[in-house]
């Protein structure tokens, strides 16, 4: 009755989903106007301390869901004073924003120069860096809902592959890249570089949206431009800042799978509907044995999702920065580390960890030196070290196997005394061994990947007032290096088929 035979091979792998949960239970609506009662479109409204936010419509209206009555709504708009309002027991919160004269005197980075905001005529939106400090190690996930005209979405919650995609003022082309131009301290970088930035290191974050603002970037700025400048040292004694975070991650929604008995009954009903005279695949004995939890080797009842995935995971992030300096030189140093893990269960039968585990360390150093009264030099150094541990297949493939796997065909592995004399796991299968066994696919291997990115930058600024007042020269040179090393280890699972069954 039951034995092994038919040794088979198969390959699959796993990665997983991990999204921050945001509970939403209170609906707050309202209207935002200026002191003359004119509606303000594009006002950013956020639940303080979260990424939950919306922008007002052209009529100044908004609707936002919050968790509790103690939540604080943050209203911010360029040229106006920001306001914080506690929801309390209010369902309608109307706000009058007051103009900010100081903000018009603030400096705005515009392509290759800086201007006062009151002289900028292009469409440029700025985001307060403090609003980007959410419980996530991926900066791109902080951009959703921050301003009008930006579409931001994620296609995966898998750690390491969870970069948000974003468009500025919609999709501009269906046949070419739609990503905006991203500049950090004047250098073009990728979405990955932006994703790895620490919010604590950002001095300003601006988005140029129209042709006037992006004209100096030519065709490369057709999809909009994101400008980021990092913090620099200030004269004075050294100031030290430290921040540590723990965050809880879980799927926002999971599928409910039928148990083995319900699956077999519904399968038989579907068969009768198609052909009432056809023999049923699952006999009464098979259904009865499964329902009464008899020998799991003969009557398996496997919830593949529960076997592979955890309910939640914990992530950690820390940042330490120091800045200071004297009359001649100023410095800003920052060191950060983050750890993101996935939802895969680590099986005790394995002597390795194939769950996603990403450790990332960032080092940033900005040094400004005043060589003479008219000559300044800036040296900027950035490096990120990342170690990725995890399975070597895509989340879509593995999750697809979980969705397709039959809960009653075979167990994840056969459990017999002394393992029937074999020194390896007896993974279950059926027929010719070609059925997907998601569990075997998950535990059969892992990979380690080490990456290191270094970006060095030197800027020279020379005041040329002796030629004509206001004339300056600025030169910039940079070097970027990238290194990667990957090790993969896996084995071929031994699949076993039960040849005799009492069904």
Predicted feature residues:
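Flexible loop and strand-edge segments within Gram-negative outer membrane beta-barrel domains
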Residues: 251-253, 296-336, 340-344, 354-435, ...
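Surface-exposed, low-complexity/disordered Ser/Thr/Gly/Pro/Asn-rich loops and linkers
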Residues: 439-441
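Outer-membrane beta-barrel pore domains and translocons
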Residues: 243-247, 336-338, 382-384, 461, ...
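Short, small/polar-rich motifs associated with maturation and membrane association
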Residues: 2-11, 20-364, 376-377, 430
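Cationic, amphipathic, low-complexity alpha-helical segments enriched
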Residues: 497-503
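Short loop/turn motifs that connect adjacent beta-strands in outer-membrane beta-barrel proteins
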Residues: 233-238, 327-328, 374, 463-473, ...
């Amino acid at each position: 009755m039951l034995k092994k035979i038919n040794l088979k091979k198969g390959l699959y792998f796993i990665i997983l989903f991990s999204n921050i949960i945001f509970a939403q239970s209170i609906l707050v609506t309202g209207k935002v106007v200026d002191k003359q009662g004119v509606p303000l479109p594009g006002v950013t409204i956020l639940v303080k301390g979260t990424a939950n936010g919306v922008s007002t419509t052209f009529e100044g209206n908004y609707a936002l869901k919050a968790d509790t009555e103690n939540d604080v709504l943050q209203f911010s708009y360029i040229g106006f004073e920001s306001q914080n309002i506690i929801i309390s027991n209010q369902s309608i919160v109307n706000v009058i924003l007051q103009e900010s004269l100081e903000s018009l005197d603030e400096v705005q980075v515009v392509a290759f120069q800086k201007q006062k905001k009151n002289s900028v005529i292009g469409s440029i939106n700025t985001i307060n860096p403090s609003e980007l400090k959410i419980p996530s190690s991926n900066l791109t996930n902080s951009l959703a809902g921050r301003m009008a005209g930006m579409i931001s979405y994620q296609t995966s919650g898998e750690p390491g592959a969870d970069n948000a995609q974003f468009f500025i003022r919609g999709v501009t082309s269906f046949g070419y890249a739609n990503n905006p131009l991203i500049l950090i301290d004047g250098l073009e970088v990728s979405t990955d570089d932006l994703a790895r930035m620490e919010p604590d290191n950002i001095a300003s974050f601006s988005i140029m949206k129209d042709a006037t603002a992006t004209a100096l970037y030519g065709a490369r700025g057709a999809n909009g431009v994101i400008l980021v400048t990092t913090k620099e040292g200030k004269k004075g004694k050294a100031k030290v800042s430290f921040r540590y975070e723990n965050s809880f991650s879980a799927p926002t929604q999971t599928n409910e799978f039928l148990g083995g008995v319900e699956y077999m009954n519904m399968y038989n009903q579907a068969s009768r509907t198609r052909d009432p005279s056809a023999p049923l695949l699952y006999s009464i004995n098979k259904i009865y044995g499964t329902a009464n939890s008899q020998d799991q080797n003969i009557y398996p009842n496997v919830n593949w999702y529960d076997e592979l995935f955890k309910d939640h995971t914990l992530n950690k992030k820390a940042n330490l920065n120091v800045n200071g300096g004297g009359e001649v030189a100023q410095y800003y140093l920052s060191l950060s580390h983050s750890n993101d893990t996935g939802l895969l269960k680590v099986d005790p039968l394995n002597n390795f960890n194939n769950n996603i585990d990403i450790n990332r360390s960032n080092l940033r150093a900005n040094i400004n030196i005043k060589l003479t009264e008219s000559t300044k030099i800036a040296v900027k150094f950035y490096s990120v070290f990342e170690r990725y541990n995890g399975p070597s297949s895509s989340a879509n493939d593995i999750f697809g196997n979980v969705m397709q796997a039959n809960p009653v065909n075979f167990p994840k592995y056969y459990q017999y005394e002394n393992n029937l004399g074999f020194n390896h796991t007896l993974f279950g299968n059926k027929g010719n061994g070609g059925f997907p066994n998601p569990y075997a696919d998950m535990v059969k291997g892992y990979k380690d990947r080490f990456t290191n990115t270094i970006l060095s930058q030197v800027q020279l600024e020379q005041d040329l007032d002796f030629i004509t007042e206001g004339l300056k020269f600025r030169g910039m040179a940079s070097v970027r290096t990238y290194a990667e090393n990957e090790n993969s280890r896996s084995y071929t699972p031994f699949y076993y088929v039960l040849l005799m069954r009492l069904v």
